[in-house]
Amino acid sequence: ILAGLEKPDDGLVQVQSNTRIAYVAQEPQLDAASSVFDAVAEGLQRVRYLIDEYSQGHGDLDAMQSEIESLDGWNWEQRVTETLQRLHLNPEAIVSTLSGGTKKRVALAQALVAQPDVLLLDEPTNHLDLDSIEWLEGLLVDFTGSIITITHDRSFLDNVATRIVELDRGKLLSYPGNFAAYLLQKEEQ
C-alpha cells in the first residue's frame, strides 16, 4: 500500500506532500536489455519526463522548472553516475548478464538515485552473499531517510533496525531498538 502497488480495502492513506518514496521489490523487475545506467536512470523517470517537456516548451514552464529544481533534476545524469560509483556498478553492463545479487544492487541504485525520504525494502538480503549483505547494512546505516523493510533475516535486523513494528491480528505494536531488543521486550510482556 505504501509503495502504491495496492489500494487499501478501507480507510485513507495520507502521505505528506513532496515526500519521495522508493520501493525495492523482493524480485526486482528490470528491463533485461537495458544497460545498468539506463536501468538506474529509470528511478528518475519523472525528472526526465519534466526536462523533456520543459525542453519542448510544453505546459507551464515556470511550474516545471520549479519542480525540476525541487527534485534536483538538472544534474540527473551526474546523480546516476555518482550512485553507480557508490554501489560499485558498471554503467555499461547489460542487465540480462548480471547475477541476482548485482540485479538487486541495480534495483537499490534505482531507488537511491531518486533521493527518497522513505525507502521501502522487501526482503532486501535475498540473492545477496555475505559481503553484499554487509555492504547493504553499511549503506542503510548511513541512509538519512526512513527505511521500512520486510525481512526474515534476523541478523540483518539486528544490524540496521532502530525500531521493530509488529502487526498481529489487526494490532500494530511498536518496539524501540533492534531485533534482539524486540525479543527481550516481547519476553517481558
Predicted segments with their positions:
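ABC ATP-binding cassette signature C-motif
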Residues: 1-189
